[in-house]
């Protein structure tokens, strides 16, 4: 796998003994250590049903994604008309009775709404030609109740009786959110955390584990994906009424990771552990999974952008530095289960730019949700978070399909500027801001793999931090406020900087000045710019 991807990306080598963080300053990068290939990536989450319809049935499909690959990445790093993402996360593509696909009928077959396995292999090949990795959603916690395995288990067929979790009498406890988890069937009860239509696998059954291992092997070896996004990891193995982050779940996850590493040492495992940073980071720190999604951090960015105050972001970023192996967490703003960013921010494009800038200039592995880059709107129920991609201003269909209507009505705004076509015509659009930020991250190894140091800013509405590598230092300034900032002064503690004499703006407009650095590497009363505009981001190389 890595050999395929090395044509486009390279491992980022970190300098010896860089100090990471601001407050703790205890974690260091090992001399000459290389970060994994995924740290060079910006991933893009796609709900296949809603991205592009290629055959006119009103539903998105795999061939539709192939048709739109040039929008995502045209394969030429020197161009700027594509988005520039370098990884795709496909939400479930397996055969399923539901629109969302998280209740799987057949783990080795493609949902016919989306195409065929040959179509998926063609998409993977086309993506790899552009240097784009492809990972797929994998649901190991539960299946569809319509999966043949469940009926065989209910009937007690040999080899399947304990495939799911059964009880002769209702154990009586409820789920973590107070929901019913024990469901009657044939005079007995089965456990289904996410509802009666999605019974949980019995992952303490070696036969189930062996089957799921072989499914992972099939997708990595036979299909050729570059990794797996694991759904609902914290719920894998229950211990009585304890249903989240159990010791048994950690053990099962660690064993799966070891198996996957044997199959493909370069495969990425990224997990959904919808918990606080402390619980989520345990899976990575223990070597049980490569990355987990950072839900606390995502919330801090949106809260900070919405309140025009980066204080919470700074606190969370420092916590990530302290809790995770360096850079080994997946950052994002929102996903398919959450209200869309622009809806959370009440249509404020300036705040959306602040959120995007924070995400794409910070450590970690960033993930975008399709349509986020154009400010698509969406609030629950879930179907309204997963509406068709708005490619143009065409009423009803937005360039998504040639059918009279898409499978789901559009979100508001495609005729009022929330579309790719409209924003491509506007140099100052949110889409072009995302393109520029992703290009910046792709071009600057220090943004992908450098350490992070917060700076004290005289204006609390400004998020000011350094990204540092062996021979490179970048100063990032993000004005969270809707007002201009003048007379900004920064202060850095001992060891913050080497001697620098030059300052070059590499993102944003205007000039910049270099700081006067003391012998101990500290500086104070540093005025890097004359002013920052409302919601402005400026990145400055110090040398």
Which residues are covered by each model-predicted region?
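Short glycine/proline- and charge-enriched loop/turn segments
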Residues: 101-110, 288-298, 384-387, 520-521
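N-terminal structural segment of carbohydrate-active enzymes
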Residues: 25-136, 141-153, 158-160, 169-218, ...
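Structural recognition of the beta-strand scaffold that forms the well-ordered cores
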Residues: 42-45, 87-92, 135-136, 227-229, ...
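C-terminal beta-strand-rich structural cap/linker in extracellular carbohydrate-active enzymes
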Residues: 518-543
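Intrinsically disordered, low-complexity Ser/Thr/Pro-rich tracts
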Residues: 1-32, 543
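Loop/helix patches that line or flank the sugar-binding groove of alpha-linked glycan CAZymes
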Residues: 38, 83, 260-263, 275, ...
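Beta-strand-rich binding/interaction modules
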Residues: 484-511
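Alpha-amylase-like alpha-glycosidases and glucanotransferases acting on alpha-linked glucans and related
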Residues: 31-43, 144-240, 247-363, 414, ...
């Amino acid at each position: 796998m890595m050999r395929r991807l090395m044509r486009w990306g390279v491992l980022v080598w970190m300098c010896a003994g860089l100090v990471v963080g601001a407050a703790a300053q205890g974690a260091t990068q090992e001399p000459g250590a290389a970060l994994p290939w995924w740290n060079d990536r910006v991933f893009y989450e796609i709900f296949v049903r809603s991205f592009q319809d290629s055959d006119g049935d009103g539903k998105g499909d795999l061939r539709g994604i192939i048709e739109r690959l040039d929008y995502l990445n045209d394969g030429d790093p020197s161009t700027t008309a594509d988005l520039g993402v370098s990884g795709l996360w496909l939400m479930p593509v397996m055969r399923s009775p539901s629109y969302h696909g998280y209740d799987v009928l057949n783990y080795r077959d493609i949902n016919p709404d989306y195409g065929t396995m040959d179509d998926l292999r063609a998409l993977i090949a086309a993506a790899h030609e552009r240097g784009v990795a492809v990972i797929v959603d994998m649901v190991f916690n539960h299946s569809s109740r319509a999966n043949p395995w469940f009926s065989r288990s209910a009937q007690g067929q040999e080899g399947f009786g304990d495939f799911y979790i059964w009880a002769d009498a209702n154990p009586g406890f409820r789920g973590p959110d107070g929901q019913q988890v024990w469901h009657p069937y044939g005079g007995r009860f089965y456990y289904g955390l996410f509802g009666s239509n999605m019974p949980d696998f019995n992952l303490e059954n070696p036969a189930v584990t062996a089957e799921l291992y072989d499914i992972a092997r099939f997708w990595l070896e036979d299909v050729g994906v570059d990794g797996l996004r694991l759904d609902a990891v914290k719920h894998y193995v229950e211990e009585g009424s304890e249903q989240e982050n159990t010791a048994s779940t950690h053990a099962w996850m660690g064993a799966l990771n070891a198996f996957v590493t044997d199959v493909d040492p370069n495969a990425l495992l990224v997990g959904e552990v919808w918990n606080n940073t402390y619980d989520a980071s345990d899976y990575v720190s223990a070597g049980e999974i490569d990355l987990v999604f950072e839900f606390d951090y995502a919330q801090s960015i949106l809260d900070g952008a919405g309140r025009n105050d980066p204080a919470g972001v700074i606190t969370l970023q420092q916590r990530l530095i302290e809790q995770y192996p360096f850079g080994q967490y997946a950052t994002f703003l929102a996903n398919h289960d959450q209200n869309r960013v622009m809806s959370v921010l009440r249509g404020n494009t300036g705040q959306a730019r602040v959120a995007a800038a924070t995400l794409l200039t910070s450590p970690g592995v960033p993930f975008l949700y399709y349509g986020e880059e154009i400010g698509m709107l969406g609030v629950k129920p879930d179907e309204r978070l997963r509406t068709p991609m708005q490619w143009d201003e065409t009423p009803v269909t937005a360039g998504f399909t040639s059918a009279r209507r898409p499978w789901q009505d559009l979100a508001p705004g495609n005729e009022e500027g929330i579309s790719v076509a409209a924003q491509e015509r506007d140099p100052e659009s949110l889409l072009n801001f995302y393109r520029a930020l992703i290009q910046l991250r792709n071009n600057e190894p220090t943004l992908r793999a450098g350490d992070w140091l917060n700076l004290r800013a005289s204006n609390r509405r400004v998020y000011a931090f350094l990204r540092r590598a062996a021979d490179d230092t970048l100063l990032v300034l993000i004005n969270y406020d809707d007002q201009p900032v003048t007379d900004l002064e920064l202060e850095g503690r001992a060891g913050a900087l080497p001697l620098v004499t030059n300052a070059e703006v590499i993102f944003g407009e205007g000039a910049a000045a270099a700081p006067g650095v003391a012998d101990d590497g500290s500086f104070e009363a540093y005025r890097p710019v004359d002013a920052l505009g409302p919601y402005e981001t400026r990145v400055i190389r110090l040398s």
